[in-house]
């Protein structure tokens, strides 16, 4: 075991933890003020649920070497038997417990991403139950299939590359968000009102915390304080910067002015796009990934939602699902064995196999997310009854109806 690597990965785990409150602020700033508390709560509560589930059975189901390609076994329930001195794999330089702590933070933020799609119209108790079953049915199996020993999609399977969560985190949550918002239906005034962002500074602060945590998210996935971690750190920043610029350019073309919300959203889109390939693609490719991910997400947000008629309230699918798919495919275009020996060369180097593996992995991830979300929705409806809030509660705002709180109370206890 290497003490430097242990300290580095634990620090990165703390960075990733910050992403969840950062997401709460990012989402909370985007909604109307009557839904701020509820929107932030639907991210924050998952810190509690996600960590407890991970310790009790999540890590075991995700990473225990079960011998099958789909899910782990129960040998590490309650983290019993998870070593403090031996690695998850024979060549690991960090203890199994440290690896578990790092992955735990991924399991927390992933279901939180989904909640943005249904902001302002889903009962809190239903989100609570849905999150539990989604983690069980979608996230843990996918984590095992992509990153676990003998997993269907990873190095022991079809060979799809996912350095830090393109499939496991972004595509799974983004596609699930799309399915859930379609099942739940549109907000009552979706096509008749102009939704105004209530607090732009909060959005910027949230996006900044997300990017701060994302450096640990991607660099930490090298699982060592080495050159690969440095490379992933740099590709992360480069892609985010390029994506911010290209989103601003899209804003200028469409609206004649750059916007602060656009710059913040573009930065997040670039972070999503580079996640699957951060430790596999050259630095120049990170620029291309960032520059192209923003326009793809921008088109989905500006035109795709209207064209296909779904109400993805805070663009969880349009940003994370679309950006994750695009980034995953471009990983198959630009991946380079010289950067990471575990990767195959991509299309630009004249080889097709890696791109094919990426496409197959993305396709399987989408199927799992769609089917799993349908199952989770059915279970949630069975256990909680009606999932959507009543029209009166939706009009009044979920802060009061679901939590009895207001983010901005006036002297008489009501929103000003």
Regions found by a protein language model. Name each.
Residues 1-416:
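Glycine- and aromatic-enriched membrane alpha-helices
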């Amino acid at each position: 075991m290497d003490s430097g690597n242990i300290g580095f990965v634990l620090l990165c785990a703390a960075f990733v933890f910050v992403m969840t409150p950062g997401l709460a602020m990012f989402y909370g700033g985007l909604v109307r003020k009557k839904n701020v508390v509820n929107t932030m709560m639907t991210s924050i509560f998952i810190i509690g649920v996600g960590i407890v589930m991970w310790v009790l059975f999540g890590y075991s189901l995700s990473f225990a070497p079960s011998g099958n390609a789909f899910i782990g076994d129960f040998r590490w329930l309650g983290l019993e038997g998870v070593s403090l001195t031996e690695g998850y794999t024979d060549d690991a330089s960090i203890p199994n417990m440290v690896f578990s702590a790092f992955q735990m933070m991924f399991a927390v933020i992933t279901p939180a991403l989904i909640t943005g799609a249904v902001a302002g119209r889903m009962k809190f108790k239903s989100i609570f139950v849905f999150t539990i079953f989604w983690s069980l049915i979608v996230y843990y199996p996918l984590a095992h299939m992509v990153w676990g020993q003998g997993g269907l999609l990873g190095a022991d399977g079809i060979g799809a590359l996912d350095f830090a969560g393109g499939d496991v985190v972004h595509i799974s949550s983004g596609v699930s968000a799309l399915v859930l918002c379609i099942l739940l239906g549109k907000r009552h005034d979706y096509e008749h009102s102009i939704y105004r962002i209530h607090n732009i500074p909060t959005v910027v602060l949230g996006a900044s915390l997300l990017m701060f945590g994302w450096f640990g998210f991607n660099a930490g996935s090298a699982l060592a304080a080495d050159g690969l971690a440095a490379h992933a750190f740099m590709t992360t920043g480069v892609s985010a910067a390029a994506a911010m610029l290209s989103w601003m350019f899209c804003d200028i073309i469409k609206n004649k002015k750059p916007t602060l919300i656009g710059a913040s959203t573009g930065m997040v889109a670039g972070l999503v796009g580079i996640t699957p390939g951060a430790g596999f693609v050259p630095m120049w490719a990170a620029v291309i990934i960032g520059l192209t991910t923003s326009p793809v997400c921008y088109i989905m947000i500006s035109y795709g939602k209207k064209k296909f008629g779904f109400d993805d309230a805070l663009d969880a699918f349009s940003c994370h699902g679309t950006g994750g798919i695009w980034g995953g495919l471009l990983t198959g275009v630009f991946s380079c064995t010289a950067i990471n020996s575990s990767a195959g060369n991509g299309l630009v180097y004249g080889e097709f196999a890696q791109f094919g593996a990426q496409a197959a992995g993305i396709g399987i991830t989408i199927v799992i997310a769609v089917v799993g979300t349908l199952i989770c929705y059915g279970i949630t409806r069975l256990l909680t009854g009606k999932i959507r809030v009543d029209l009166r509660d939706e009009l009044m705002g979920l802060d009061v109806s679901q939590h009895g709180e207001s983010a901005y109370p006036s002297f008489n206890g009501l929103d000003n």
